[in-house]
Amino acid sequence: MTAIQLIVGLGNPGPEYEQTRHNAGALFVERIASAQRVSLTADKKYFGLTAKFSHQGNDVRLLIPTTYMNRSGQSVAALANFFRIKPEAILVAHDELDLPPGVAKLKRGGGHGGHNGLRDIIAQLGNQNDFHRLRLGIGHPGDAKLVSNFVLGRAPRAEQEKLDASIDFALGVLPDVLAGDFAKAMRELHSQKA
């Protein structure tokens, strides 16, 4: 079991993107920082907002890239390479069109599924896709032509409440995730209903 050393929350920078569906991953990392009572601070070296906390004697780094989504890998690779963090010790939290709001799923490895943030991370890690993902469901607009405006839009209140609930569920299994006990975390998280 590999302990998680880096948790990345994907999103786009700037106030115009705050609270958009595409920033679900960043919201997750913000909630971790708040729970751990650490401040995310800008770090130009890693092209993002970073923080660090300790869990069972291990350092865990938080990262929200301040590059745009399709350049997230630049930020992730800079931090992972500097601290020699292997892909299997990274958890990337991101919005997931293929899951309904209120559903969160853990996954290890796989493709990018059309997600430009994941696509760039895989490329910047030297085509290594063996990192863990926290997929936060945002639903799908029903037509591929509507996806861009959908992910960059704010969710209606009821939908946002479901997303917030799925983040709460994910925070509940975070100790198991950090310890590398993904089987237990997946059993608990995947049985939750928002």
Swiss-Prot record:
Print the keywords alphabetically.
Cytoplasm, Hydrolase, RNA-binding, tRNA-binding
Q: What class of enzyme is it?
A: hydrolase
Q: Name one GO molecular function term.
A: peptidyl-tRNA hydrolase activity
Subunit-structure text: Monomer.
**Known EC number:** 3.1.1.29
Q: Which PANTHER family does this UniProt record tie to the protein? A: PEPTIDYL-TRNA HYDROLASE
Identify the taxonomic lineage of the organism of origin: Bacteria, Pseudomonadati, Pseudomonadota, Gammaproteobacteria, Pseudomonadales
- Marked site (Stabilizes the basic form of H active site to accept a proton) residue numbers: 95
One GO location term (cellular component):
cytoplasm
Q: Where does tRNA bind?
A: 17, 68, 70, 116
**Active site as annotated:** 22 (proton acceptor)
Its biological function?
Hydrolyzes ribosome-free peptidyl-tRNAs (with 1 or more amino acids incorporated), which drop off the ribosome during protein synthesis, or as a result of ribosome stalling. Catalyzes the release of premature peptidyl moieties from peptidyl-tRNA molecules trapped in stalled 50S ribosomal subunits, and thus maintains levels of free tRNAs and 50S ribosomes.
- Superkingdom per UniProt: Bacteria
Q: Which GO terms describe its biological process?
A: protein quality control for misfolded or incompletely synthesized proteins; rescue of stalled ribosome
- Site feature location: Discriminates between blocked and unblocked aminoacyl-tRNA: 12
Where it sits in the cell: the answer is: Cytoplasm
Keyword Transmembrane helix attributed: no
Output the InterPro entries linked to this UniProt entry: Pept_tRNA_hydro (IPR001328), Pept_tRNA_hydro_CS (IPR018171), Pept_tRNA_hydro_sf (IPR036416)
What organism does this protein naturally occur in?
Pseudomonas putida (strain GB-1)
Q: Which reaction does it catalyse?
A: an N-acyl-L-alpha-aminoacyl-tRNA + H2O = an N-acyl-L-amino acid + a tRNA + H(+)
Q: Belongs to which family?
A: Belongs to the PTH family.
This protein is called what?
Peptidyl-tRNA hydrolase
| Keyword Cytoplasm belongs to the record | yes
